[in-house]
């Protein structure tokens, strides 16, 4: 049986009559992400609550852990990637505890076990931001104590929510999906430009994703950057020698069984005669809607189309 996911929220505290994180956590109970069911837990806003998950980890294992809490002064959700080794309460916790300028362990700051650079955050609900300051209150203490106990790489972080958010539940589900999906594979994608047009190549019937159109390229090999990868891959796929130009951008796409980070660069033919090895057709395009693109390649084609005016004589 697949390990469960743990999502925690907090009860109300201080001047707040409700805590948005409590309702969000409760709403996720029993939901499933990539075959893992969610268990929800509401924590008290005190030492016992901050240490509860760390104690549970003595006898339970989870596929992923998200702590959710309220950041009343934030305008955007915050993905916290660091738990600071300090407590300095501005108000007492719900047990009356008021800790001032105190270390949690004395061992230094701890870092969340996630890779937000692989998450394509700009496409996520309500535009979350990555933060390295979880504060000096119970939220920070809870994340710190949980991270102290994790020794197997279980993905875990703290999500701070603003007072008002349109779809906090949807955002948490997006975070969990990214925590559990495969790590990104770096792939080069070449925007071959010639005579004011760019090249699209159709995958042959013997290839994965047969019949779909893409930009030529492939996976980085050890020690390669995007330019080196594309020079090698386009030679292998099309028998063309190329020079790389400006970087167009990066796109992350989840194919289900694999997640790729596409590094897209302008490319220019410098030699060779085109011969197709993994494709069965090519088209020179001057817009994004001339072929049926694979994955995010239509968005890439749109970005490249906007640049073509700089390459027309």
Predicted feature descriptions by range:
Residues 1-136, 146-152, 156, 170:
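N-terminal catalytic or cofactor-binding beta/alpha core of small enzyme domains
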Residues 138-180:
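Active-site-adjacent mobile loop/cap segments within catalytic or ligand-binding domains
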Residues 160, 192, 264-268, 284:
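Short, well-ordered beta-strand micro-motif
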Residues 165-182, 296-313:
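Charged phosphate-binding loop/patch that engages nucleotide di/tri-phosphates or the phosphate backbone
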Residues 182-199, 219:
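Conserved N-terminal beta-strand and adjoining loop/helix that marks the start
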Residues 197-236:
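Conserved Nudix-box catalytic region and its N-terminal flanking loop in Nudix hydrolases
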Residues 235, 239-271:
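Active-site segment of metal-dependent pyrophosphate-handling enzymes
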Residues 266, 275-307:
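NUDIX/MutT-family hydrolases
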